């Protein structure tokens, strides 16, 4: 999990320009990290590329926190 979280954190920091300390498993992309819907779509696309997974629109709609993203990747990559 640590390696996945580390990579996800780097992508979020690079994409959203937030401090690494704000990226926690409980952090909401929209509420805590300031992402808008376009940011979330771009994050999902970058996660797909980085981890070699395909995230369906339905699944992407349920990825609201950093922890959701990490869990999805661990279960599907």
UniProtKB/Swiss-Prot annotation:
Source organism superkingdom: Bacteria
Keywords per UniProt: Cytoplasm, Fatty acid biosynthesis, Fatty acid metabolism, Lipid biosynthesis, Lipid metabolism, Phosphopantetheine, Phosphoprotein
Swiss-Prot/TrEMBL GO biological process terms: lipid A biosynthetic process
Pfam families membership: PP-binding (PF00550)
Metabolic or biological pathway: Lipid metabolism; fatty acid biosynthesis
Location of the Carrier domain: 2-77
Compartments, as annotated in UniProt: Cytoplasm
Post-translational modification: 4'-phosphopantetheine is transferred from CoA to a specific serine of apo-ACP by AcpS. This modification is essential for activity because fatty acids are bound in thioester linkage to the sulfhydryl of the prosthetic group.
Molecular function per GO: acyl binding; acyl carrier activity
Similarity field: Belongs to the acyl carrier protein (ACP) family.
Database matches in PANTHER family: ACYL CARRIER PROTEIN, CARRIER DOMAIN-CONTAINING PROTEIN
NCBIfam families: acyl_carrier, PRK00982.1-2, PRK00982.1-4, PRK00982.1-5
Function per UniProt: Carrier of the growing fatty acid chain in fatty acid biosynthesis.
Record's protein name: Acyl carrier protein
Source organism per UniProt: Listeria welshimeri serovar 6b (strain ATCC 35897 / DSM 20650 / CCUG 15529 / CIP 8149 / NCTC 11857 / SLCC 5334 / V8)
């Amino acid at each position: 999990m640590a390696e996945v979280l580390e990579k996800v954190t780097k992508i979020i920091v690079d994409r959203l320009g937030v401090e690494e300390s704000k990226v926690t498993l409980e952090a909401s992309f929209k509420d805590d990290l300031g992402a808008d819907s376009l940011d979330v779509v771009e994050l999902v696309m970058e996660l797909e590329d980085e981890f070699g997974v395909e995230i369906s629109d339905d699944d992407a709609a349920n990825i609201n926190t950093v922890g959701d993203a990490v869990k999805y990747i661990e279960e599907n990559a």
